[in-house]
Amino acid sequence: MEDFYQHIYQKQQAVQDMPSNKAIAQWAVGLMHLLFPERNSKTFHTVQEIEDAFKQSEADLYLMLFKTKACSSCNIKKISEQFFTNLPSIYERMLTDAKAIMDGDPAAQSLNEVIRTYPGFLAISIYRLANELWTQGIPLIPRILTEYAHSKTGIDIHPGALLMSTFISIMVLVL
């Protein structure tokens, strides 16, 4: 038994420090709630509150990257800032995805319904966040995000995949 304990101890010493998968997923879910209030019961009362919430999410991303040993050589300040600079265009792609799902599914009653309830929208949206981090060279975190979406939706999209709008339409037909 002593060899077994020693083996487990050595494995634990070799584990790379990083936030838990749950904390990483919670960051993405929180960001989704900011982007799409349809997915959340919390609303903000001023533009300043929204701006502060996005700044907090950026700080949370920075801290998450800082706590990730595999990111020790990354320029985490630049990556965090670039992610949030690119967020408006990521958001626009997410809206385009939601519209494509709605247009491709005759059962969809509204954009609100697609955003709030469709697993395909959640999977693609989390992928969009993960892909931005993947593109910036962040290790492991993008895959954790897409695996979170996979666990919630059954839809597995690699964070490095390149999705075109035709993919969204085809996916709607398959789902």
Where do the protein language model's features map onto the residues?
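Terminal amphipathic alpha-helical/low-complexity segments used for targeting or macromolecular assembly
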Residues: 1-147
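Structural signal for interior beta-strand "rungs" in well-ordered beta-sheet cores
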Residues: 149-175
